[in-house]
UniProtKB/Swiss-Prot annotation:
Domain notes: Contains a C-terminal catalytic domain, and an N-terminal region which modulates catalytic activity.
GO biological process: chemotaxis
Organism this protein belongs to: Myxococcus xanthus (strain DK1622)
Catalytic activity: [protein]-L-glutamate 5-O-methyl ester + H2O = L-glutamyl-[protein] + methanol + H(+); L-glutaminyl-[protein] + H2O = L-glutamyl-[protein] + NH4(+)
Name the UniProt record assigns to this protein: Protein-glutamate methylesterase/protein-glutamine glutaminase 4
Compartments (UniProt record): Cytoplasm
Amino acid sequence: MKNDPLRILVAEDSPTARRLLVEIVRADPALTVVGEARDGVEAVELAQRLRPSLVTMDIQMPRMDGLEATRRIMTEVPTPVVVVSTLVERDIQTSMAALRAGALAVLQKPLGPESPDFDADSRRLRDTLKAMAEVKVVRRWPDRTAPPAPVPTPPAPPVSPTRPGVVALAASTGGPAALFRLLSELPASFPVPLLVVQHIAIGFSEGLAQWLRTAGPLPVKVAEDGEPLLPGHVYLAPDDRHLGVRGEGRAEVSRAAPVNGFRPSATWMFRSVARAYGPASLAVILTGMGQDGLEGVRELHGAGGRILAQDEQSSVVYGMPGVVVGANLAHEVVALPDLASRLTSAFRGSGGV
């Protein structure tokens, strides 16, 4: 029933950490714990038997780790999965791979009641579980180790009168996997810098950058304030900082106030890009929950920039791109498999790719 609590399966091998997670979840009457798994094998079995609303997934577990368990669940019994990980390098990289395998979000494992951030971290965990439990996980993108299915070549988009000078991308839920696929298909000769705002838990931005470096030939890094924005380089917004552009083509990393609760904010980035590049701006709104980016896209559209939005079918969550399309601000709505070719086509005949 609509008002029944969401049914959570907790997968965690440490008894202490598992008890803590169960207590945090049970503190919210909108959530209930229906099962506890001590390893990945149990997580898959319980997901099949209990059909929970969502699974919280540890990464390092005996018998089967969280990455393989996520893959199995997404293949055998598609269920929203939220990775709850430590900030250990090995765990961060595996967490990123779990996002590509189908997990919707990654959160830092709460440190315990003695931590000054415990209440805020616990509330963030519960809020994330409630939001992600509503996501319909019914599709998986094929792994690039398998031969890609042939797709028709899309018609060339209308040529913009102004050659883009930057590409600004925004994403939330489902974004890491979408970014990985996009970057795997862009050429090393891509002629302009790419800025990225990806909503992700604090502590995971550097790990995300390291993981995205393995996708393809483009260098990926967390942006530093004042550094020059180089063609064919990808710059991610740092933890809890806005990312934009200074007028002279350098990165601006800012501690300015959050925009509608977000820092980094897609709207902040799009506004900055619109001011710096005007009609030479190209914005891409990828899969994500909520409306971050809408007002910034509105300003970028008014400045003459071009806007692409991911289509509903290839989006994990059609929130961020959906509101842009609904506001009639998108010049094109593009399926994820076609996005790289759309971007490269924007530079054909103008000295670019």
